[in-house]
Design a protein with these regions (language model features):
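Hydrophobic, aromatic-rich transmembrane alpha-helices
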Residues: 147, 152, 249-252, 313-342, ...
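Membrane-lumen/periplasm interface segments of specific transmembrane helices
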Residues: 262-298, 317-318, 400-410
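Transmembrane-helix signature of polytopic, membrane-embedded enzymes
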Residues: 18-22, 102-124, 128, 152-174, ...
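Interfacial juxtamembrane loops and adjacent helix segments
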Residues: 57-140
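Short helix- or helix-capping micro-motifs
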Residues: 26-28, 168-173, 200, 227-231
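Membrane-interface transmembrane helices that cradle and orient dolichyl/undecaprenyl
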Residues: 157-159, 198-220, 230, 333, ...
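Short acidic/glycine- and proline-prone juxtamembrane loop motifs at membrane-interface regions
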Residues: 42-43, 177-191, 357-361
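Perimembrane helix-loop-helix junctions
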Residues: 4, 200-210, 227, 239-272, ...
Length: 411
């Protein structure tokens, strides 16, 4: 009897581990909502809203330029995501205005007595007519932060078990640096999601290549999409994730190393198509993406010193020091699952973009938390597991308290 193919799909389970992870992500989103509810619209918000809306509603509105902000040469996906909720909300309100009395219409400016729109309404004109503009601007980035947290938990739980997953996710959800990146329109949280997801998807593809070919395709499609997010967040993120991922794939796929290069090349080529779509199939506008200064990279200890010297990150700092001591002193902690994220963190933390604004140290943070989760999980399974669990719980509580204490500073 032939089995229906949908019956072979792994069933999603929402048991206690998933509920705990969902609770932590809920606390993460609650902190983001609290910050957002107390913020005010800034010039940066207006720029992302204006340019993002133009990409959806009227690209090329200014002759010779992709948007009135000029030709976006880096981070086009952030503009797209910032403008999408506003454009959708405006479209919905215009639809409802058809059934409203003229004096009750939400979108008042630029409409004739017959309801025809004469011109595109600016974000400044809409600031009092569309509710929750500030929240709509931040929803995509809060969503990206929650998705990165879910991916972090999924990776660490599969590698290290429940304790490793809880440790990494708790430190992530109470990280002021991550919250700060999620409560303002910017490409950094998107790049962090792409770099972390891309490298671990590369490792997943390499493992799948040991099995039948039918398991390759969905992972390669996912890898292509993640590479697309990388190149449209920061151009430099694509070669970084491709090269690091390629190195790990060659490490893992011992018997199929000859097929690793075509897989990475296909995913990278597909990401360029994704970027072309984000630029509205405008080759001229996309040409500004490939500028030399977009891929200039330098190295300095300043980003790491600034992060670890912050009092709000004291819990992560102490956890990092403890994890490094255990990694160097305990043989069982030195294996691929712990070494890979440590190498990524050591490479990305001192990296600095010199041609464009960027924060590669933020891209390194999920790898650092993965490393901490793995080493702590090993310690909790050792001979002094009770002491290790008590120490880990104390550090998580410390980081949570410091994060909540620092929330007003993120406004």
């Amino acid at each position: 009897m032939k089995t229906h193919r949908f019956s072979r799909i792994r069933r999603f389970r929402f048991n206690l581990p998933q509920r705990i992870a969902a609770g932590l992500l809920f606390l993460f989103l609650a902190q983001g909502m609290w910050i957002t509810s107390r913020q005010k619209l800034s010039d940066n918000d207006y720029q992302y809203a204006r340019c993002g809306r133009e990409m959806w509603e009227s690209p090329g509105a200014v002759a010779g330029y992709f948007t009135s902000c000029g030709n976006i040469h880096d981070g086009v996906l952030a503009y797209r995501l910032a403008g999408l909720p506003l454009s959708v909300n405006l479209l919905v309100e215009r639809g409802f205005d058809v059934f409203r009395k003229p004096e009750d219409r939400v979108v008042q400016v630029g409409a004739t007595p017959t309801g025809a729109v004469l011109r595109t309404l600016s974000t400044w004109e809409l600031r009092h007519q569309l509710t929750h503009i500030l929240l709509l601007l931040r929803l995509p980035f809060l969503g990206a932060g929650a998705l990165l947290g879910a991916g972090l938990w999924w990776v660490t739980r599969r590698l290290y078990g429940n304790l490793g997953g809880y440790t990494a996710l708790a430190l992530y959800c109470f990280s002021p640096a991550v919250l700060s990146a999620c409560v303002t329109p910017n490409p950094e949280i998107l790049a962090s999601l792409a770099v972390y997801g891309g490298i671990y998807t590369c490792i997943g593809v390499a493992h799948a290549m040991q099995g039948p070919r039918r398991k390759w395709r969905p992972r390669i499609v996912l890898l292509t999409a993640i590479f697309g997010v990388a190149v449209t967040s920061h151009l430099i993120a694509l070669p970084l994730v491709a090269l690091i991922g390629l190195g790990f794939m060659l490490w893992v796929a011992e018997e199929r190393r000859g097929q690793v290069f075509p897989v990475v090349a296909i995913a990278a080529g597909g990401s360029i198509v994704f970027a072309l779509v984000c630029y509205g199939f405008s080759a001229n506008a996309m040409g500004f993406l490939f500028r030399a200064q977009n891929v200039l990279l330098n190295f300095s200890a300043e980003p790491a010193l600034r992060f670890f010297s912050s009092f709000a990150n004291a819990g992560v700092t102490v956890a990092t020091a403890a994890a490094l001591v255990l990694y160097c002193g305990v043989r069982r902690s030195r294996y691929f699952g712990n070494t890979a994220p440590l190498l990524c963190a050591l490479l990305l933390f001192p990296s600095m973009l010199t041609g464009v604004a960027g924060s590669p140290w933020l891209w390194a943070l999920p790898f650092l938390l993965t490393f901490i989760g793995g080493v702590f999980a090993d310690a909790c399974e050792g001979p002094k597991s009770r002491w290790a669990m008590a120490a880990a719980g104390s550090l998580l509580l410390l980081q949570a308290v410091l994060c909540l204490r620092s929330l007003p500073e993120l406004l």
